[in-house]
Amino acid sequence: MSRPRNNPQTSSPQDSTKDGSSFHYFQGRFELSGKSRQYPADALEPQPGIGDVKVIEKATKSMLDPAQRSHFYLVTPSLVFLCFIFDGLHKALLSVGVSKRSNIVIGNENKETGTLYASKFEDVLPTFTALEMSSILRHCCDLIGIAAGSSDPICTNSLQVQRQFKAMMISIGRPLHSESADLLISYNAGPAIDWINSRPWVGGLMFTFLFGEFESPACELLDQVKVVASKAQMMTYYTVRMFLDQCVDGSTALPAVVLEIPVFEQKKPLAKKVLGDFFEFGGVLRHPVIGVLSPQMFPNLATAANYWAKRRNSTFSGFEALDIIPGSTITFPVLQMASAQKISRGSDMDPYTLNILRGYGISGFE
């Protein structure tokens, strides 16, 4: 005699998990309180400070000395140098929560002080040589990495910074200092770049730097910042734009890429409308609308564009982008095969792909 078959709607393992009933098996086996061991009170992250504005010259002169500099949290000297160069920055930093007091390095103890200058300057107002001034400007030029969003792309001794500093020294009439202003060459700007970039107010700071009016030499310094800031942190957007305009191989017609072309083309005018004339600086200003142009919004298109750019354009050879954007479904073998073929422009192309490429004028389709 045949037995009746179980009703799959009532006995399916998949269905029984919908209300969590199958997990009763695990409940009660490991009963934990949910609490966790906490960090001790003295394990707070060290913080930089900028001292009192009345003694910023004393603090700056003191921080030129490596021995004095070594007593303080790594970011403190960089902030002091910036406050020395840019009048009014000290007050602005205090207004966004930067402390006057800085952590100091004393063994493993976590202590702080508001006195950032050496005792020998207690009753002396220091003066600065031209070489000292240029060295401070050189360090501030290193801090251009703030615009790049990280200390990784721009290192103290990178050729990019050297070129920008040389251009700045020529513009202020001190070309010889482009080589000799090295008093701070061993002081790494990286910690300050990353610390400032982690602050919620970094977008406001960059807006002031980029669009404020400054006299020399701050003006010439910020001219170099603008060179880096223009299109910074938006490289993937410009890579995709170039890919769609110039690529003539089969990778633009990959189905996964074609599906995301309308997404990219529709998000672009939204960002431009919100940012207006500031669009090319949107990444540096950390405007939230730039998120609509994140490569995660069109991962297959961004992956194909990065692959194409790194192979076809030497400008992008050092572009540090992920080879495969998270969320992408296309693979390198697929890209390799597609890029080895010229894009079809005949009747063999499926209507949807043809309409997308024609509709958005991709790769010269009309």
Curated annotation (Swiss-Prot):
InterPro entries to which the protein is assigned, alphabetical: P40_nucleoprot_BD-vir, P40_nucleoprot_sf_BD-vir, P40_nucleoprot_sub1_BD-vir, P40_nucleoprot_sub2_BD-vir
This protein's name: Endogenous Bornavirus-like nucleoprotein 1
Biased composition (Polar residues): 1-15
Misc remark: Bornavirus is a non-retroviral RNA virus that does not generate DNA forms during viral replication. Therefore, integration of EBLN-1 must have occur through a mechanism relying on an endogenous reverse transcriptase activity.
Entry-linked Pfam families: BDV_P40
Signal peptide (residue range): none
Stated role: May act as an RNA-binding protein. Highly homologous to the bornavirus nucleocapsid N protein that binds viral RNA and oligomerizes.
Domain of life: Eukaryota
Expressed in which tissues: Expression detected by RT-PCR in a few cell lines, including OL, HEK293T and MOLT-4. Not observed in HeLa cells.
The gene coding this protein: EBLN1
Region Disordered, annotated ranges: 1-22
